[in-house]
């Protein structure tokens, strides 16, 4: 018997969930004027807002995987790396790489412009991959969701790691390209053009919203 395809190009509010990854104050409202300008030039927050508004209009549940590390770093494994996150000098025994924002801090709160409402689901996480030892997979499957739209940052770190996890769990993938970002060179462009198209669909917010109501 032939296998019946369940592929559907539309993004229905029933079968699709929106994932807003690490939309924290510390990332979206940093103490770096240069980074804030970078995000503003690319309309990252307004694009995330438009995507969230579109999802809510069709009753789509939104999930917020958000870093929630212990203040003392006890839930983070120290590791030796060739470089730090910005390709500078790496971690060492006397200079370990620790979480940037810790649970309970203002920086670890979700940015107010895209704050969750009562029907949304906040997923505390302690690793890049939002599915790793969290209940994100359970929360999605319990609602009958088989496709995810993802936005946030950083594209080359948590977004990529989460999408590799989603693919291994057989979720359909849509990447909202103009609502994702990386401040590290051309990493965002590389993933959007060379990696993610092999895993799912890459499109702008306007196209995502249009498919939500298709």
Each PLM stretch: what is its role?
Residues 1-117, 199, 211-214:
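Active-site acidic carboxylates
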Residues 57-60, 144, 170:
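Glycine-centered short loops/turns at secondary-structure junctions
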Residues 62, 173-175, 202:
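Hydrophobic beta-strand scaffold residues
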Residues 100-148:
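Internal catalytic-core helix/loop-beta-alpha segment
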Residues 123, 200-208:
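Short acidic-hydrophobic, aromatic-tinged amphipathic segments that line or gate anion-handling sites
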Residues 149-153, 170-185:
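A short glycine-rich beta-strand->turn/loop micro-motif centered on a GG-aromatic cluster
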Residues 156-162:
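Short glycine/serine/threonine-rich phosphate/pyrophosphate-binding segments
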Residues 183-196:
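Active-site-proximal loop->helix
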